Amino acid sequence: MKDYLVKALAFDGEVRAYSVRTTNTVSEAQRRHDTWRTASAALGRSLTAGTMMGAMLKGEQKLTIKVEGNGPIGPILVDAHANGDVRGYVTNPHVDFEGTEQGKLRVYQAVGTEGFVTVIKDIGMREPFIGQSPIVSGELGEDFTYYFAVSEQTPSSVGVGVLVNGDDSILAAGGFILQIMPGAQDETISFIEDRLQKIPPVSTLIEQGLSPEELLYAVLGEDKVKVLETMDVQFNCTCSRERIESVLISLGKTELEQVREEEEETEVHCHFCNERYKFSKEDITNLIENL
């Protein structure tokens, strides 16, 4: 099954809902960064939340998420675009902890329970929108829920889950975001709160193979949900050799000549996708000649 996202309304417009399958997306991130189990879960949850938050934007708009906790995984960075493209990395990919007796990964131990979630939105204005909230649990779903309440004043519920196999490969990943719209009835809010208490964890639902639509039906009730739009999502980095060449050219002739003099081979590393671009002395000479 391909990865895709669903945008929906529920309860006659009282609730805005997003749901996504990100199994392939998180698998690609795990492959590129060689993340261990707990790091994969943390990065995967962040990518899943970022994908849905990106889908709230329009056109060429994009956002960056920084999760900066006090745990050994270090900062997590995610870039997400309105078109479904997402990329991201963890600072320390080789972090893992023993799971609970129920097999649940201890993501909070990797992320830490103190720190901040920062969201930077580039929505075409002169200055980006920057929102920040403290980490409240380190499990990330709760932390993004709190972010929406504090920074965007939008009562929300964020559920994100990643299942990791014993060999570090990704079994399943996905999640949902529910947002209460202004004027929603108390009965609607109570109904959703009750459902959220009763449904299995997100990771259990996605392990059962539920589609994004079925995930929303499980949370809200099939008769309450109206699907508005679906779109493909994927791990996609914007870096390329041409872009890196442009960055090198921007250094100017003097600095490029110094690089050519000092290095047999110049390597530029993209943290987001772990791609490495190598430039020989001849490559650098060609760049200088094109200035």
From Swiss-Prot:
Cysteines paired by S-S bonds: 237-239, 270-273
Bilayer-crossing regions: none
Record-linked CDD domains: Hsp33
Entry GO CC: cytoplasm
Post-translational modification: Under oxidizing conditions two disulfide bonds are formed involving the reactive cysteines. Under reducing conditions zinc is bound to the reactive cysteines and the protein is inactive.
Cellular compartment(s): Cytoplasm
Main location class: cytoplasm
Alphabetical GO biological process terms: protein refolding
UniProt entry tagged with the keyword Chloroplast: no
Taxonomy, superkingdom: Bacteria
Pfam families referenced in this protein's UniProt entry, alphabetically: HSP33
Molecular function per GO: protein folding chaperone; unfolded protein binding
Record SUPFAM superfamilies: Hsp33 domain, HSP33 redox switch-like
Keywords: Chaperone, Cytoplasm, Disulfide bond, Redox-active center, Zinc
Chain's role: Redox regulated molecular chaperone. Protects both thermally unfolding and oxidatively damaged proteins from irreversible aggregation. Plays an important role in the bacterial defense system toward oxidative stress.
PANTHER family, per database record: 33 KDA CHAPERONIN (PTHR30111:SF1)
Family recorded in the similarity comment: Belongs to the HSP33 family.
Protein name as it appears in the record: 33 kDa chaperonin
Species lineage: Bacteria, Bacillati, Bacillota, Bacilli, Bacillales
Gene: hslO
